């Protein structure tokens, strides 16, 4: 089991540790709901050092990324970032990623922890036709996420740059608590916030400085409930190797006007199901629970849980394209009425 550079700090702060993607990570410190609401109302800090980081460099870096990713990497100016996906040749999704342009011929790609080896092998195979260098920088990169409406105010007291000039999806160098870092105004919670890329030896002093300044340590439980309220996908749940992204709420990522791996297969597929948001009248939905309409199964929950803001069970679910509802979710043998909800479940910042 791998440990992040913050493992000892988590234990000192009383974290309950769990295995996630081969890493020992904090599930929670106090309570998931408490940590969730701290991020929605103030500011929380997450250790996301398990995420993978690849550096893409070379004169054909952009051409390679245009082929390997579904979004238009050509629109990225230096110092900007975008959400994207790695399509496979069948029109499915190898992974969903964040891509940062660090220089004219240098990019940083952040991938999901469980997919690091798979993604690297996939990209290395694609890179053979391009003058490009791929480096797995995951082991020498620690990553913190500072999220919440008070994130900017808290972080401003610890950095040497004016954060008020930075927009969503900006990426820039800075010193945080005296340590060199790369900051990005990005996140996975639906709140404003920053992600901090650091050398492993700088992670603990920066993390503790953020906590001392008032950021509440938050674990994987709150990270998942926050992204669920925000209607964000989790790879392996809403997105898989078999998912056509054009049949999801994230179809906007796919730029059909450019060439990319699997484009023809993706465009040729008819959508047989659609992803919906559901708010239950009672009970807590979980992955795999059946969605019913008129007593018949018409879909399945891909992510579910309790929404601390709505104080209800909420779910992301795939239902048959023609299914109209009203819907119910089968919770422990009981058909619980579930109202369709637009996504996100809560307003994004």
Swiss-Prot record:
Keywords on record: Aminotransferase, Transferase
Catalytic activity as recorded in UniProt: N(6)-[(R)-S(8)-aminomethyldihydrolipoyl]-L-lysyl-[protein] + (6S)-5,6,7,8-tetrahydrofolate = N(6)-[(R)-dihydrolipoyl]-L-lysyl-[protein] + (6R)-5,10-methylene-5,6,7,8-tetrahydrofolate + NH4(+)
GO biological process: glycine decarboxylation via glycine cleavage system
SUPFAM superfamilies for this protein: Aminomethyltransferase beta-barrel domain, Folate-binding domain
Domain of life (superkingdom): Bacteria
Pfam family, one: GCV_T
Assembly with partners or alone: The glycine cleavage system is composed of four proteins: P, T, L and H.
PANTHER family in the record: AMINOMETHYLTRANSFERASE, AMINOMETHYLTRANSFERASE, MITOCHONDRIAL
Function statement: The glycine cleavage system catalyzes the degradation of glycine.
Homology family: Belongs to the GcvT family.
Protein name as annotated: Aminomethyltransferase
Name of the gene this protein is made from: gcvT
């Amino acid at each position: 089991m791998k440990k992040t550079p913050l493992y000892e700090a988590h234990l000192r702060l009383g974290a309950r540790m769990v295995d996630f993607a081969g890493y020992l990570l904090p599930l929670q410190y106090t309570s998931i709901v408490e940590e969730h609401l701290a991020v929605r109302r103030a500011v929380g800090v997450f250790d996301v050092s398990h995420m993978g980081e690849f550096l893409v460099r070379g004169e054909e870096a952009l051409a390679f990324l245009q082929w390997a990713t579904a979004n238009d990497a050509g629109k990225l100016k230096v110092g900007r970032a975008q959400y994207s996906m790695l399509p496979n040749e069948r029109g499915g999704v190898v992974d969903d990623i964040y891509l940062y342009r660090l220089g004219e011929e240098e990019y940083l790609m952040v991938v999901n922890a469980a997919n690091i080896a798979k993604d690297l092998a996939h990209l290395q195979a694609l890179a053979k036709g391009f003058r490009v260098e791929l480096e797995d920088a995951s082991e020498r990169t620690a990553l913190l996420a500072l999220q919440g409406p008070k994130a900017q105010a808290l972080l401003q007291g610890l950095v040497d740059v004016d954060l008020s000039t930075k927009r969503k999806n900006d990426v820039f160098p800075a010193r945080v608590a005296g340590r060199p870092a790369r900051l990005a105004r990005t996140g996975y919670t639906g709140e404003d916030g920053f992600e901090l890329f650091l050398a492993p030896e700088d992670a603990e002093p920066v993390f503790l400085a953020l906590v001392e300044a008032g950021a509440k340590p938050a674990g994987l439980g709150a990270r998942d409930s926050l992204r669920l309220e925000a209607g964000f996908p989790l790879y392996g749940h809403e997105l898989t190797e078999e998912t056509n992204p054009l049949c999801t709420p994230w179809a906007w990522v796919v730029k059909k006007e450019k060439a990319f791996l699997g484009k023809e297969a993706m465009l040729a597929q008819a959508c047989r199901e659609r992803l919906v948001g559901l708010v239950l009248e009672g009970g807590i939905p979980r992955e795999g629970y059946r969605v019913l309409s008129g007593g018949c199964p018409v879909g399945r929950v891909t992510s579910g849980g309790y929404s601390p803001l709505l104080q209800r069970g909420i779910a992301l679910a795939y239902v048959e394209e023609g299914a109209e509802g009203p819907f119910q979710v089968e919770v422990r043998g009981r058909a619980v009425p579930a109202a369709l909800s637009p996504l996100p479940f809560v307003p994004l910042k």
